[in-house]
Amino acid sequence: MKFGEWHWDETGAPKDGAIVITVDIKAQVMSVFRGGWEIGTAVVLYGAGATPTPLGVFHITQKDADHHSNIYGGAPMPYMMRLTNDGVSIHGDLVADGWATHGCVGVPTPFAKKLFGIAKLGDRVIVTNGETLGVGQPIKAA
Protein backbone atom coordinates (compact mmCIF):
# COMPACT_ATOMS: atom_id res chain seq x y z
CA MET A 1 0.00 0.00 0.00
CA LYS A 2 1.08 3.57 -0.60
CA PHE A 3 0.98 6.61 1.69
CA GLY A 4 -2.59 7.77 2.12
CA GLU A 5 -4.12 4.43 1.08
CA TRP A 6 -6.60 2.54 3.18
CA HIS A 7 -9.16 -0.22 2.73
CA TRP A 8 -12.32 -1.05 4.68
CA ASP A 9 -14.49 -4.11 3.98
CA GLU A 10 -16.80 -5.67 6.55
CA THR A 11 -18.19 -8.27 4.10
CA GLY A 12 -18.42 -11.64 5.85
CA ALA A 13 -17.19 -10.29 9.19
CA PRO A 14 -19.30 -10.81 12.31
CA LYS A 15 -21.56 -7.86 13.16
CA ASP A 16 -20.32 -7.89 16.74
CA GLY A 17 -17.22 -9.15 18.47
CA ALA A 18 -14.18 -7.61 20.07
CA ILE A 19 -12.37 -4.87 18.17
CA VAL A 20 -8.59 -5.29 18.19
CA ILE A 21 -6.33 -2.81 16.44
CA THR A 22 -2.75 -3.65 15.51
CA VAL A 23 -0.08 -1.17 14.43
CA ASP A 24 3.21 -2.36 12.97
CA ILE A 25 5.63 0.57 13.00
CA LYS A 26 8.19 -1.23 10.82
CA ALA A 27 5.60 -1.99 8.10
CA GLN A 28 3.81 1.35 8.70
CA VAL A 29 0.45 -0.44 8.69
CA MET A 30 -2.60 -0.54 10.93
CA SER A 31 -5.04 -3.45 10.82
CA VAL A 32 -8.48 -3.46 12.44
CA PHE A 33 -10.09 -6.75 13.46
CA ARG A 34 -13.64 -7.45 14.62
CA GLY A 35 -14.37 -10.88 16.04
CA GLY A 36 -11.06 -12.08 14.59
CA TRP A 37 -11.80 -10.87 11.04
CA GLU A 38 -9.70 -8.13 9.47
CA ILE A 39 -12.08 -5.39 8.35
CA GLY A 40 -9.73 -2.45 7.76
CA THR A 41 -6.14 -1.59 7.01
CA ALA A 42 -4.27 1.66 6.40
CA VAL A 43 -0.79 3.08 5.98
CA VAL A 44 0.16 5.03 9.12
CA LEU A 45 2.38 7.85 10.29
CA TYR A 46 4.21 7.39 13.60
CA GLY A 47 6.41 9.31 15.97
CA ALA A 48 10.13 9.52 15.38
CA GLY A 49 13.21 11.13 16.89
CA ALA A 50 12.56 12.65 20.32
CA THR A 51 8.86 11.66 20.25
CA PRO A 52 8.65 8.02 19.18
CA THR A 53 5.41 6.09 19.19
CA PRO A 54 5.49 3.79 22.24
CA LEU A 55 5.36 0.04 21.73
CA GLY A 56 3.07 -2.22 23.74
CA VAL A 57 -0.54 -3.04 24.42
CA PHE A 58 -2.83 -0.08 25.09
CA HIS A 59 -6.54 0.54 25.49
CA ILE A 60 -8.63 3.38 24.10
CA THR A 61 -9.31 5.65 27.08
CA GLN A 62 -10.94 8.67 25.44
CA LYS A 63 -12.62 9.54 22.14
CA ASP A 64 -13.20 13.00 20.66
CA ALA A 65 -14.32 13.49 17.06
CA ASP A 66 -13.19 17.15 16.94
CA HIS A 67 -10.09 17.16 19.16
CA HIS A 68 -7.31 19.76 19.04
CA SER A 69 -3.94 19.23 20.69
CA ASN A 70 -3.38 21.03 23.97
CA ILE A 71 0.36 20.28 23.66
CA TYR A 72 1.16 21.16 20.03
CA GLY A 73 -0.46 24.55 19.41
CA GLY A 74 -4.01 23.40 18.91
CA ALA A 75 -3.14 21.13 15.99
CA PRO A 76 -6.25 19.35 14.71
CA MET A 77 -6.53 15.67 15.68
CA PRO A 78 -9.82 14.58 14.07
CA TYR A 79 -11.43 11.36 15.33
CA MET A 80 -8.94 11.15 18.20
CA MET A 81 -8.77 7.92 20.23
CA ARG A 82 -6.40 8.36 23.20
CA LEU A 83 -4.02 5.54 24.16
CA THR A 84 -1.83 7.07 26.89
CA ASN A 85 -2.16 9.62 29.66
CA ASP A 86 0.52 11.79 28.06
CA GLY A 87 -1.49 12.25 24.87
CA VAL A 88 -0.46 9.52 22.45
CA SER A 89 -3.49 8.83 20.28
CA ILE A 90 -4.75 7.43 17.02
CA HIS A 91 -6.18 10.25 14.89
CA GLY A 92 -6.90 11.39 11.37
CA ASP A 93 -4.02 13.00 9.50
CA LEU A 94 -2.63 13.69 6.06
CA VAL A 95 -0.57 10.54 5.60
CA ALA A 96 2.26 11.46 3.23
CA ASP A 97 5.81 10.23 2.62
CA GLY A 98 8.33 12.00 4.83
CA TRP A 99 5.79 13.08 7.45
CA ALA A 100 5.78 11.97 11.08
CA THR A 101 3.85 12.64 14.28
CA HIS A 102 4.87 13.60 17.82
CA GLY A 103 4.27 10.01 18.99
CA CYS A 104 0.71 9.51 17.79
CA VAL A 105 -0.48 7.06 15.15
CA GLY A 106 -1.77 9.10 12.22
CA VAL A 107 -4.15 7.47 9.73
CA PRO A 108 -6.00 8.90 6.72
CA THR A 109 -8.92 10.96 8.06
CA PRO A 110 -11.68 9.00 6.23
CA PHE A 111 -10.24 5.79 7.73
CA ALA A 112 -10.07 7.42 11.18
CA LYS A 113 -13.77 8.33 10.87
CA LYS A 114 -14.73 4.70 10.14
CA LEU A 115 -12.55 3.41 12.99
CA PHE A 116 -13.94 6.03 15.38
CA GLY A 117 -17.44 4.83 14.51
CA ILE A 118 -16.83 1.25 15.66
CA ALA A 119 -14.13 1.60 18.35
CA LYS A 120 -15.21 1.66 21.98
CA LEU A 121 -13.51 2.79 25.15
CA GLY A 122 -11.39 -0.10 26.38
CA ASP A 123 -10.73 -1.60 22.94
CA ARG A 124 -7.21 -3.01 22.67
CA VAL A 125 -4.48 -1.47 20.49
CA ILE A 126 -1.27 -3.46 19.99
CA VAL A 127 1.74 -1.48 18.72
CA THR A 128 4.79 -3.47 17.56
CA ASN A 129 7.93 -2.86 15.55
CA GLY A 130 7.83 -5.80 13.17
CA GLU A 131 7.10 -8.47 15.77
CA THR A 132 4.76 -11.28 14.83
CA LEU A 133 2.94 -13.88 16.88
CA GLY A 134 2.46 -17.52 16.01
CA VAL A 135 -0.90 -19.22 16.33
CA GLY A 136 -1.73 -19.64 20.00
CA GLN A 137 0.98 -17.31 21.30
CA PRO A 138 -0.30 -14.87 23.94
CA ILE A 139 -0.24 -11.12 23.49
CA LYS A 140 1.88 -9.72 26.31
CA ALA A 141 1.02 -6.41 27.95
CA ALA A 142 3.54 -3.60 27.90
Question: Predicted regions span which residues?
Answer:
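Cell wall/extracellular polymer interaction/catalysis modules
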Residues: 1-52
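Exported/periplasmic cell-wall-interacting domains
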Residues: 5, 9-16, 51-57, 62-142
